[in-house]
Amino acid sequence: YRKIRNTARFILGNLDGFDPNTDCVADDQLQEIDRWALAALDDLIVSTNAGYAVYDFNKVYHAVYNFCVVAMSNFYLDVTKDRLYCTNGVARQAAQTAMYKILVALDKIIAPILCFTSQEIWDFLPKTEGMNKYVVFEDMPKAGQYAADEAFKAKWAQLIAVRDEVKKVLEQARAEKTIGASLEAAVTLYCNDAVYDLLNSIPMDELADLMIVSHVELVKGEGGSASAVEGLGVAAAHAVGEKCERCWKYSDTIGSHSAHPTLCARCASVVEA
């Protein structure tokens, strides 16, 4: 219960000031990881609707719990923190748009089994026209709206597998005192052609956010520590540059803005905007 509540609370906190009537972005402005999160939501809708249809509330609870812990807290919400905390504009609104859609659907799903909690969440959710005052009067979400094709799901299963291998190498680097927090790291990924094409399909800044490191470099060929992903080697070193006091990433652009000597160029531009 606490995991479900905390997931909702985190999302609500990051929707402060978000107006779904004016701030939602179009689907083509969502980042791929936002689309992945919505696809995971669609899978949850399929599973919970099937559970409710046969009164299998245990199945519903476990599906919701796994979604909140594995898909949201341990992955999506963790990866999107940099966008939410450190940027303005479309990138941040894209994450908020996905999170808003996720929480609206999730709250409807839990309403039959967590009545008071779901209404408490609903009271704090920003509303659009036509939404009921009470969540129990809302229709259950229908599957298909956020469904992704199998190729997209397979791609992201591979990306998550790569991320898991990077995390292993970062843990080793942490044990060797090479780095402390993961944002102190710069990661080099040695790839065969297939893995290179997979990773290169994601913008490098988004790939770094996915790994929660300051820098990612792709290299064709062999190198680094062997991994469970075929055609992938991983190496980690301490990132060059200094730590930005705002985003905590390491960058060689620290101090490039005279008015903000402790910020990276990105954060300085956001603060000045």
Positions of PLM-derived features:
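Cys/His-rich metal-chelating microdomains
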Residues: 250-253, 270
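Short metal-coordination and nucleic-acid-contact micro-motifs, chiefly zinc-binding Cys/His arrays
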Residues: 240-243, 260
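Acidic, turn-prone loop/beta-hairpin segments
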Residues: 18-49, 77-169, 173-197, 216-235, ...
